């Protein structure tokens, strides 16, 4: 008996909506990454992009446990000498909560061509409204 290998032409993609209100950032991000990779499907094949689309709403209401809001920093380099910048997560949550979820999920995806293709299927919105009603997304509850 041969093992099943998914082909890119056989992949059927669904749309899911996840409400991030009151959810812990890391736990939420790992579940989203699993859906983007397609690991929740029995047809999962590591070298084929079998994942689904994910729309995250209420990104501004995601929770960080402990004192991470004050202690954790997002660091980035501008490309100039002395250009290592850091922003406290508390400030980042106020200005760009969509980026916090995007960055957490991106770190859990493969660091290759497949991962770059997978992250494009993640749509994150600050409030409860999103513009993907036409795709008829299915509501997904994550604990």
UniProtKB/Swiss-Prot annotation:
GO terms for cellular component: cytosolic large ribosomal subunit. Transmembrane segments: none annotated. InterPro entries: Ribosomal_uL13 (IPR005822), Ribosomal_uL13_bac-type (IPR005823), Ribosomal_uL13_CS (IPR023563), Ribosomal_uL13_sf (IPR036899). SUPFAM superfamilies: Ribosomal protein L13. Pfam families: Ribosomal_L13. PANTHER family: LARGE RIBOSOMAL SUBUNIT PROTEIN UL13M, RIBOSOMAL PROTEIN L13. Part of the 50S ribosomal subunit. HAMAP family: Ribosomal_uL13. This is Large ribosomal subunit protein uL13. It comes from Caldanaerobacter subterraneus subsp. tengcongensis (strain DSM 15242 / JCM 11007 / NBRC 100824 / MB4) (Thermoanaerobacter tengcongensis).
């Amino acid at each position: 008996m041969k093992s099943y290998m998914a082909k890119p032409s056989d992949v059927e993609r669904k749309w899911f909506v996840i409400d991030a209100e009151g959810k812990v950032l890391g736990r939420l991000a790992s579940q989203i990454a699993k859906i983007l990779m397609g690991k929740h499907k029995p047809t999962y094949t590591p070298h084929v992009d079998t994942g689904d689309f994910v729309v995250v709403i209420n990104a501004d209401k995601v929770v960080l446990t402990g004192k991470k809001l004050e202690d954790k920093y997002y660091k980035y380099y501008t490309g100039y000498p002395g250009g290592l910048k850091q922003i406290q997560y508390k400030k980042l949550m106020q200005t760009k909560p969509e980026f916090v979820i995007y960055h957490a999920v991106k770190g859990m995806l493969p660091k290759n061509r497949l991962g770059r293709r997978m992250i494009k299927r993640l749509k994150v919105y600050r409030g409860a409204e999103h513009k993907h009603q036409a795709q008829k997304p299915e509501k997904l509850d994550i604990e």
